[in-house]
Amino acid sequence: MVPSIKVTKILDPIFENRCLVPFISFSENESFPDGTKPPVWFALSEDRPLAFFAGIWTPQWKSVRKVKEGETTNALFAFLTTAPNTEVGVIHPKAMPVIFTTPDEIETWLTVQTPEAMRLQRPLPDGALKIVARGERKDG
């Protein structure tokens, strides 16, 4: 697992609002010596089946997102990250999203107490993801 700053006490209430973020593929930018950073697209297979990121949400996040608007209250979500597996680590060595692929993982994430749910914060096994495309999206 990626070492993290101990902010869980501050964020405890947010972790009570767990959700799923559906996806069929996701990208990480590959860095080249010339400064270019084209995206590399990952999925469970070439068919790009549905999977889910481990998400958290809050309905009342107060912040200044645009100076002209001042402080606003927004509903926000984010997804958790963890250490990368082999496939993602070659492109992005620091982290990858926490991904659920089974009904049991989904049920656990959505229903159990936070300490037990956080045990799901781990990378997919090596070989579970495939590079399905490189470069800018061309499918929409």
Question: Can you say where each PLM-predicted feature lies in the sequence?
Answer:
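A structured binding-face within diverse protein domains that lines the active/interaction site
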Residues: 1-140
